[in-house]
Amino acid sequence: MIHSNISIQINGEPFNCSKPISLQFLLNYLDFNSERVAVELNDILLPETLFHSTYLNDQDKLEVITIVGGG
């Protein structure tokens, strides 16, 4: 498998990583609980069921929103 570096944006901030990388792996690496986040990839809201099978590409834009319960 050939690895290459890609540049993506996470919540508007640049982030460099190796390709191939799945969305689930990246969320785990960044300590996000995938059951408590909403993720937009290039302006498309992704269901959690696609996190494992979605691989990131150069120049992708992610918005990760943490869902917090309260009362």
Swiss-Prot record:
Subcellular location(s) of the protein: Plastid, Chloroplast
Record carries keyword Manganese: no
Alphabetically ordered keywords of this record: Chloroplast, Plastid
Domain of life: Eukaryota
InterPro entries: Beta-grasp_dom_sf, Mopterin_synth/thiamin_S_b, Thi_S, ThiS/MoaD-like
GO CC annotation terms, alphabetical: chloroplast
CDD domains assigned: Ubl_ThiS
Plastid as UniProt keyword: yes
NCBIfam families listed in its UniProt record: thiS
Family the entry assigns: Belongs to the ycf40 family.
Protein name (Swiss-Prot/TrEMBL): Uncharacterized protein ycf40
Lineage of source species: Eukaryota, Rhodophyta, Bangiophyceae, Bangiales, Bangiaceae
